[in-house]
Amino acid sequence: YQGGISLTLMLDPNHVQISPIACPGLLHLAFKHDTTKQFKLLHSKVALLTFKAIESEEQFIRLIVSTGNWTRQTLEDSLDLVWSIDVVPGNKDEQGKADILAAYHYFNDILRHFDTAILTDSGASKLKSYTHTQYARFHKLFDEVVVEDSIKPRFFDNRSASLLDQLPALVKPHCSEKKQDYLSLGPGFYEGGSSDAVPSVINSLHLRLI
């Protein structure tokens, strides 16, 4: 580790700031004070990582989505689900490219609320640091990803509509015409209590999807 930044982190502004000393190589981006917060809670568990070979120009992108917080408690005590894909931009994986591009657009929108000055080469100095170069390379890699309009991404979020409202229409392009009678849910925590009734959220999903 030589002071470079390899990973940036965006958390809800109510979260305690994580210092680079506590986690070398990680930059916990600060929330802008002059921006309008357009969400009640930033609570997505999504990572978009790029990897490059040391001795060649070969690169690939990894998208990770999980149901649990990325903490030691989740790792050691909870039962959670993780979904991930690896995509080489030049390959003919149209579905994978649609997924990573949808996630990239999501991150770009969220980035507007955070201070990224340390990552960009926007000053008067002509010197570019390792961090500037890596950040520019990250965005350039996604600029080269082209997706056909007919391909529907499997990655989606609730910036414009609730997940419950979107789910029925988004599931259809990725399922067969045969009707299904099975629904699997994977949240980090489940509704409890003494009632024998089906929880309201699960019942709503059941009525809309099955």
Regions found by a protein language model. Name each.
Residues 1-210:
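PLD/PLD-like phosphodiesterase catalytic module centered on the HKD motif
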